[in-house]
């Protein structure tokens, strides 16, 4: 039997597949690849910078600021942290974490009223990627830094060191919400199967958070399927989905003023769980 590689049509298809594969990059999942696309132009986010508020900050985890311990409660893994947020992350105390709705939000922090603040009190912008859980065995002002109602940021060490000296341990800060500046479109990482699909929503611009997610097949004009918030940045869809068709995703932010976008190219046809896909638009 003649080799199929002698067929010009098959050879061309294979060449195109190789060229397409060259456009994918590593993300945070086991076999994690996502389709890298350019962001489409869009309106400036209506989410505005807030006023300054009082809080406090410490640091935790690997000195590099990169690793799985910086995103567990939200659903990020190490490669997500590295590729999306670098070392500019923090675990949020319960009031800021807001049952996972605070995941992905961006804050600007500056050290105040401490001899350990770096000269000039420089600020740093971080993304909330984890929960700093309360410690009810310690008082709020002596070790229970993340106990409610405290507004506390347990930061990746490199970000904390931009604010203050390591010897401080804990410093008072002022913080404010700021619009998240992201590169590229919203990213969707998939787990589960064709009957229960779990979507990890990352790289969200503007308010940075999500309160509602719906999906529908891209080619057939079907009805929207409302996803349920699972935990952190994850949403689950209980429906039979045919992966031969791509998925369009509708997202609404959690913070006010709420904004909704439709990512028509969110997940390409023949999608596979375990991979990450990136749409072409965001909350800009």
From Swiss-Prot:
One of its GO terms (biological process) is plant-type cell wall loosening. Residues 71-185 form the Expansin-like EG45 domain. GO terms for cellular component: extracellular region; membrane. Pfam families: DPBB_1, Expansin_C. Expressed in roots. Keywords: Cell wall, Cell wall biogenesis/degradation, Membrane, Secreted, Signal. SUPFAM superfamilies: Barwin-like endoglucanases, PHL pollen allergen. It is found in: Secreted, Cell wall; Membrane. Residues 1-21 form the signal peptide. Residues 195-279 form the Expansin-like CBD domain. It is a peripheral membrane protein. May cause loosening and extension of plant cell walls by disrupting non-covalent bonding between cellulose microfibrils and matrix glucans. No enzymatic activity has been found. May be required for rapid internodal elongation in deepwater rice during submergence. Belongs to the expansin family. Expansin A subfamily. This is Expansin-A17. It comes from Oryza sativa subsp. japonica.
């Amino acid at each position: 039997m003649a080799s199929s590689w002698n067929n010009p049509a098959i050879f061309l298809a294979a060449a195109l597949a190789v060229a397409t594969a060259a456009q994918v990059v590593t993300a945070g999942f086991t076999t994690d690849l996502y389709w890298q696309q350019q962001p489409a132009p869009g309106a400036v986010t209506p989410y505005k910078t807030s006023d300054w508020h009082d809080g406090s900050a410490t640091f935790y985890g690997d000195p590099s600021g990169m690793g799985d311990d910086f995103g567990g409660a939200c659903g990020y893994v190490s490669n997500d942290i590295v590729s999306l947020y670098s070392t500019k992350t923090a675990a949020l105390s319960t009031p800021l974490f807001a049952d996972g709705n605070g995941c992905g939000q961006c804050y600007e922090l500056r050290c105040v009223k401490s001899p350990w603040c770096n000269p000039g009190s420089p600020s740093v912008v971080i993304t909330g990627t984890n929960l700093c859980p309360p410690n009810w065995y310690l008082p709020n002002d002596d070790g229970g830094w993340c106990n409610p109602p405290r507004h506390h940021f347990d930061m990746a060490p490199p970000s904390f060191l931009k604010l203050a000296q390591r010897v401080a341990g804990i410093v008072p800060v002022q913080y404010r919400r700021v619009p998240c500046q992201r590169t590229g479109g919203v990213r969707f990482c998939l787990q589960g199967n064709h009957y229960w699909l779990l979507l990890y929503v990352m790289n969200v611009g503007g308010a940075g958070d999500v309160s509602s997610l719906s999906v529908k097949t891209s080619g057939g004009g079907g009805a929207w399927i409302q996803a349920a918030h699972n935990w952190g940045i994850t949403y689950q869809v209980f429906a039979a989905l045919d992966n031969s068709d791509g998925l369009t995703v509708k997202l609404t932010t959690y913070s006010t003023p709420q904004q909704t976008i439709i990512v028509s190219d969110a997940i390409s046809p023949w999608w596979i769980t375990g991979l990450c896909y990136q749409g072409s638009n965001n909350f800009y």
